[in-house]
């Protein structure tokens, strides 16, 4: 009798995706982040569903409903903090996943890469709208500042902003629609993940050497299922440590003050995972220029396959490119730090320099160094 996992129409799909999937024998722990992102998405959807059962998307009761979840709902506090800190874990895994893609040249699978960029935009949009929901000071002012950026779009800007707000300012209509979008987007993300995996399984996984590994494949189960399980254990341990020992470490104290349109906080800043993009936005004095730079800071990933000039796919054997990659990482950390600082000297000039270096590295330095490395191969 044929094994059910190989004959049943539904089990066959699961089998080809998670059990008998041929995987390269040499993929390192850097390949764990895909499954960890799946775990994060699962945690966020489940905790979010339970939070939505008690949350009210009304300006008068939103803040107190979050307080009610933490104080009166059974284990509401842990659900709320798992959701808030789960978002941070999600972005840590996302950044490491994208970083691994850049380092090992995974962007040459352009369909998978482009769906990944769409996923990144969708997750960022979801996180932004989720941050508005508790209706604290930073929620309200963050929503006001970021949505207001759309007014920089010529001709339609002002109308577009008022259309998104549902009025002439961030108010009840804005909060209600943000809640609706925040609820539906994770399911759209889950669908995009399926497409992401569909394209990935068309080509098979990349590996650290960047060399085609068809001659040396091993089954995904048990080798990589056990490896992923260890990753899950690490992630859950880290998340629970954060939630149970310092749940507010990554949050903003201003968000424990109910939203007040008449009182602007001294420093309006987004969550830590948006600070690098926020720093790029602030580094350009022109409003429209800043908005374009903000969008391009992520959209620039889409041109990476076009800028790949090296004869080798991975950076594993390209020391000059490796140095530039780590300069890029340091630059992004600098931008993250700058994004959380007030707009004053010397932070303004540091932010402008770091923003320039970010685009200069990706668009000019890295492709040029790849060409130099091609020449060095002939020596």
From Swiss-Prot:
GO biological process, one term: mitochondrial electron transport, ubiquinol to cytochrome c
Family named by the database record: Belongs to the cytochrome b family.
Protein name from the UniProt record: Cytochrome b
A molecular-function term among this protein's GO annotations: metal ion binding
UniProt keyword Transmembrane present: yes
Superkingdom field: Eukaryota
Residues that, per the record, bind a ubiquinone: 201
Annotated binding of heme b b562, by residue: 83, 182
PANTHER family with a match to the protein in the record: CYTOCHROME B
Keyword entries, A-Z: Electron transport, Heme, Iron, Membrane, Metal-binding, Mitochondrion, Mitochondrion inner membrane, Respiratory chain, Transmembrane, Transmembrane helix, Transport, Ubiquinone
Miscellaneous field: Heme 1 (or BL or b562) is low-potential and absorbs at about 562 nm, and heme 2 (or BH or b566) is high-potential and absorbs at about 566 nm.
Stretches that traverse the bilayer: 33-53, 77-98, 113-133, 178-198, 226-246, 288-308, 320-340, 347-367
Compartment list: Mitochondrion inner membrane
Gene3D superfamilies attached to this UniProt entry: Cytochrome Bc1 Complex, Chain C
Subunit structure: The cytochrome bc1 complex contains 11 subunits: 3 respiratory subunits (MT-CYB, CYC1 and UQCRFS1), 2 core proteins (UQCRC1 and UQCRC2) and 6 low-molecular weight proteins (UQCRH/QCR6, UQCRB/QCR7, UQCRQ/QCR8, UQCR10/QCR9, UQCR11/QCR10 and a cleavage product of UQCRFS1). This cytochrome bc1 complex then forms a dimer.
Membrane topology value: Multi-pass membrane protein
Upper taxonomic lineage: Eukaryota, Metazoa, Chordata, Craniata, Vertebrata
List of residues binding heme b b566: 97, 196
GO CC, alphabetical: mitochondrial inner membrane; respiratory chain complex III
Keyword Electron transport: yes
